[in-house]
Amino acid sequence: MTLISVAVCVRNGVDWIDGCMESLVQQSHSPLEIILVDDGSTDGSEEKVKQWDTHENVTVINQKPLGLSAGRMAALQAAKGEWFAITDIDVRPEADWIQRMLESSVSREDEEVVAVTGRTVFGQAKDTISKIRSIEIESKYRSRPRITKLANGPCSMFNRKRLLEIGGFDPSWYHAEDMEVSLKLIQDGGIIVYTPNAVVNHIPETGLKRFLNKRKRDARAHVRIHRRYKGVKHDFIGSSWIVLWMVPLLALGSFGVSLYVNNVLKLDEQNLESFYLALTREVLLICLLPLFWLSSYIRSDLPKKRLRAIFVLTSWSIVLWQGILLGYLDCLLYTSDAADD
């Protein structure tokens, strides 16, 4: 049987450790090597990690708070399996997760499968944040092809030898390390296969501040990705691009409304009719229709708490633009980025 190594990293996630580890030790595939990395936790996670160190299939690594990418690299260097799987501490893989990915790792003619990625299902709580996140992730999987360009961090498996050959996970990358290694593997001639029946369940993502901070990091990291891997057409895209344009569209619509009000107040009755005709042709169609489109989008795809949803989406759009600006600032200052070769 094929030995599979699974790496999971934790920093200050004491309440999530048992749930994740129990789902890993109960995997239907055997043999399995589970590598649990404590990334400088200060909330009691270190003690919980020590308890799991006694399990026969678990190896523990303790490191300073160096980040997820550094933790995964440490696990990769310690791994012995032919395949190296990764997941997150707030994820609960289904019992056949590893088995399903292994079944899809067999290369077809003229293919070299170097990674397999499964499907992450985000749970929903009663709050708006978790519902929006769940809907957004689900939308990304609706039309995902078999051969994909991203081995997602919560639910993927890599050929360990090929992953080491391309340098593994770069510890200097603060985010999107899964995307970086995916693109490197593809550039090296391999393919990544998506298998929808290899499922992991993500606990509901709640809390506006945490949600927005993650989306800002996403945007910041994507700038770096696009700078280093120019011309790549990503196939795992949800509603983020729609959300990105919410702030510009709202600004445009607000401009249309203010222009309308300003001109109406200045017009007399004689010129009012001609003004309305011009306004309909030039201002309403250009500036106000985006607001109707936005309203339709919210009614069709988002929870019933529309005002709260609009606030969350607008905040999301703002932090995406902030992340993009930070990403370009990184380009200028070479912050958190290895020097280009």
Sequence positions of predicted segments:
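Conserved small/polar residues in nucleotide/adenosyl-binding loops
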Residues: 334-341
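Conserved donor NDP-sugar-binding/catalytic core segment of glycosyltransferases
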Residues: 96-128
